């Protein structure tokens, strides 16, 4: 089941239930070094979730639901760390577009949860 409550087929493994706020600093770098293919699948799972849920990256997904807990925008850092530490079986430009959307467009969201609350004030 996708983030839009529809059934989807993917060409890669799909992962869900991410606590990005807790894991983006160190765990992602470690798993990218140890398991780059699986980490690439995790990165693309975030991208697919964003595409299906409003265009913005999620930050804390539980059972395919963006919970909206915690502050900040950890997923772009997670994606950058994954790439820097070896998870690269995807087009990084695609991910960069999603990162920029969340950083530059007020109202960017994931299942109605704003990617960067207060962005309009900046």
What positions do the PLM features span?
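Active-site-surrounding "flap" and adjacent substrate/cofactor-binding loops of secreted or lumenal enzymes
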Residues: 1-8, 37-62
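Short acidic, glycine/Ser/Thr-rich loop/turn "cap" segments at secondary-structure junctions
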Residues: 11, 25-28, 60-65
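Solvent-exposed loop and edge beta-strand segments that line ligand/cofactor-binding
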Residues: 11-20, 64-72
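Generic structural hydrophobic/aromatic packing signal, biased to beta-strands
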Residues: 13-16, 46, 79, 99
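Alpha-helical support elements that line or immediately flank enzyme active sites
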Residues: 16-40, 77-86
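Active-site cavity-forming subdomains of large catalytic enzyme subunits
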Residues: 52-122
